[in-house]
Amino acid sequence: MSSFEYDQIDCETRSIRLLRVLPGRFKDDIECELFLTFIDDVVPYEALSYCWGTEDEGTAPIVLDGSDFFVWKNLYEALRRLRSTDIVRIFWIDAICINQQNPGEKIHQIGQMSSIYQRAERVVVWLGPSDRESDRALSSISSLAKGTAHTVSPSDVKGKRELYIGLCQLKRRPYFKRMWVLQELANARALVVACGSHLLTPTFSVALKVSLKGLKTISRNPTARNTYYY
């Protein structure tokens, strides 16, 4: 299979590329298509907010317009999780929609990022793969978002400890250290958070803020770890 080559983008206009993620099962090859459009066109799309990854994590191939295209493993996992089994999803993803080897194009596209995130139907936050601690924390925060839980039971010592550990793990994730996070989230019309197989509603973002605020209190007062309330 040949390597991918970008079509030229018009840097004199408000043009962007969008990515069609074709439907498939979890273990199928990831197949995508790029197309050119303009920010002001009425094309429904989602914008992905995520952490690129590092060289240590390596890359994995997707099929882009019939050619091999390598992406960082974290983005690969995001595409696997976010891909639908039956419909095409359209995303704006910087690592794919911008030709990273073209400095002039990068400057042009970065200058439009606020508009790109504002125009998106929603911003999808990818926190990365889940683990046992994050599953526990996300489940608890999700319950808070739904209004079904406001405290960790005082008798549930193990639960409080696991929630504390889970929140610490979440806060240490590379995503929260990205300098673009505030701009991307501030411009979002709607927000969905994904972590592994978890896909959480917009109210989750509010609950996450409450939980992380509570985490700061716990961190300053170790005894509060045994009496943690949302």
Where are these regions (language model features)?
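Hydrophobic "anchor" residues on beta-strands that sit immediately upstream
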Residues: 90
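Conserved Walker B
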Residues: 96
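Metal-ion-coordinating, acidic/His-rich active-site neighborhoods
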Residues: 2-16, 20-47, 51-71, 78-87, ...
